[in-house]
Amino acid sequence: MSLNPHQIFNESGIQERGENARLSSFVGAIAVGDLVKSTLGPKGMDKILQSNSSGDIVVTNDGATILKSIALDNAAAKVLVNISKVQDDEVGDGTTSVCVFAAELLRQAEIMVNAKIHPQVIIDGYRIATKTAIDALRASSIDNSSDPAKFRSDLENIARTTLSSKILSQNKNHFAQLAVDAVLRLKGSTNLDNIQIIKILGGKLDDSFLDEGFILNKTIGVNCPKVMENANILIANTAMDTDKVKVFGARVRVDTTGKLAELERAEREKMKAKVEKIKSHNINCFINRQLIYNWPEQLFADAGIMSIEHADFDGIERLSLVTGGEIASTFDHPELVKLGHCKKIEEIIIGEDKMIKFSGVEAGEACTIVLRGATHQLLDESERAIHDALAVLSQTVAESRVTLGGGCAEMLMAKAVEEAATHEPGKKAVAVSAFAKALSQLPTILADNAGFDSSELVAQLKAAHYDGNDTMGLDMDEGEIADMRAKGILEALKLKQAVVSSGSEGAQLLLRVDTILKAAPRPRERM
């Protein structure tokens, strides 16, 4: 048997092994953390994302939005992007924190690997530290769910903390009230589909408001009733046009204009029969996802039925949810179709736009937040900010314990982990201690982003915690340490837990890597 090395990969395939693979993972993940860390905290900066293809721009400081908008080639960087996406889906906020924390853990791991500490020892240390940190966090949490007034105050404080790092920070009191009112209407549900967010250009951010009802950004058909009481609503996704010849590009050859008129008459009769089938459902409102042409619209108006056309798919899905109806495509069996219901439908005007308001819907918790603003970019970023606040609040209603913000929770966990490190033997203690250093980096980054002396502030914060003042954190408005409980700077326990556990698991996953295999690109076949 020949001992010469054999090439087992395609010539274009790439293999990185050992230290090279580990270094590639560390560099990619740390680069992602460094990319987003300047957006962290109440004084974090925004990023402009510009598309090469369309030229569209997005102005945001939302970690998940930034990371999913950029093309990455590094495998480890993609892992961090996925962690950020899961954080966004699960909790709604903390997407930047989880990336930065995972990157800091890997930065510490790189130092330890260079000091000849085996990755498995580091992983074991990180596991011990994660459990210690979460136990300390849970022990320090507060639960005011038994007192409605205190719990509402906690929710408003959490909303203000979440919005402090967003574009709505200057209007955080106003939007915190809107978000809390909207979430409390859900009565404990975490389904945010019952909260519709509409963006209307014009006015200022303070003009935004919460409306108790569902608002659809469409107009009512011509000559149809503009107000409907006790509405029975048929929601459909069906073609309501007679011009099939144009739609499908077919050609019909006729030798007289009479035959053309006969063809048109047949099409109209067919549409009239379809409208009669729809009317047989005993409805007074018809909402279609597709266009409703003039002829069927006139037939509905003559029958006193309100018709609404071209409702976007997202809007019609939410509408079916809140009115209790189902989206129908065929109308042969009225007894099988589930209609939606609401007490009142009316046309309203917001700014210069006409819209349709559904009041007294089946899902009594449904409501609409109407956002006003000067530019599309401002409205889009405001929507992302209010969505983050709504997501965190809905999770807090389900898991009501809260913890302190402003770097307080991180320093409290770091202290507990440092103390645990003194009880661990050998090199494992170094890994546990490194976890505490990574936790301490989060308040350091908060202070750096605010332009303060982070070394001095974090040293003061650490000293305060070791003196037993475990409610102290960073006040980024004054540039000093302060009592976070007295300041009302709170965060959801579930959010903090998710940041620590997801960041730690992501770092451990990448620490296990010793080989990266890149497949060769598929050759393009000529036609």
From Swiss-Prot:
Top-level taxon in the UniProt lineage: Eukaryota
One GO CC annotation: nucleus
Keywords carried by this UniProt record: ATP-binding, Chaperone, Cytoplasm, Nucleotide-binding
Gene Ontology biological process terms, A to Z: protein folding
Presence of the UniProt keyword Repressor in the record: no
Gene Ontology MF term list: ATP binding; ATP hydrolysis activity; ATP-dependent protein folding chaperone; unfolded protein binding
Localization per Swiss-Prot or TrEMBL: Cytoplasm
Description of how the protein assembles with itself and partners: Heterooligomeric complex of about 850 to 900 kDa that forms two stacked rings, 12 to 16 nm in diameter.
Similarity field: Belongs to the TCP-1 chaperonin family.
Function of the protein: Molecular chaperone; assists the folding of proteins upon ATP hydrolysis. Known to play a role, in vitro, in the folding of actin and tubulin.
Name of the featured protein: Probable T-complex protein 1 subunit beta
Organism for this UniProt entry: Schizosaccharomyces pombe (strain 972 / ATCC 24843) (Fission yeast)
